[in-house]
Amino acid sequence: DDPALMELAASQGPVWIIDPIDGTKNFSKGKSCFAVMVAFLNQGKVQAGWIYDPIARKTCYAVAGEGAWCDGKRLTVAGAGQAIDQLQGSLGNKMGKRLGEVIDAGEHPHPVQVQRYRCCGREYMDLALGKLQFLQYAFHLKPWDHAPGVLIAREAGYFDGFFEDASHYDATQGVPDGYLMIAPDKAAWQTLRNL
């Protein structure tokens, strides 16, 4: 959270953001759920992003305005237009608790929540690959955890926005403290936000 590092991300010059071991706790415990994340920023925007799973030797990547791929295969959004109860994804503690209340009360249709991976990179990879259809993160959204993944998700066709005003994630704006949801489309995003 060093302010000087955040200023670099917002600069106009070329900046590389690298998370050499995303999912550090998993890695330190010998678990295979970790990733390497890299983002390239230039002129104040994320221009490219990569997420590498060294165990599976799989790479998801995107170039701004040109699309997203995984090992050469074009990635497209999964779950767009589907009923909310057909979607599964990862939620933070507060949203997960709220979903539990919705389920217990037998309220309206609800999505399926999966357990957090404790590795943003792998969650973003599974979103891009269609294994998950939504992700939600809250507070202290560091660019090394989100810049590559959000770009890959956007380029695959997902919608990202903060709960407060639906503004999109911007890696050059420091470390935002809001609720960020990535969903197949804006309609799903709104339904998930309103749980």
Language-model features and meaning:
Residues A9-W69:
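DPxDG-like acidic metal-binding loop motif
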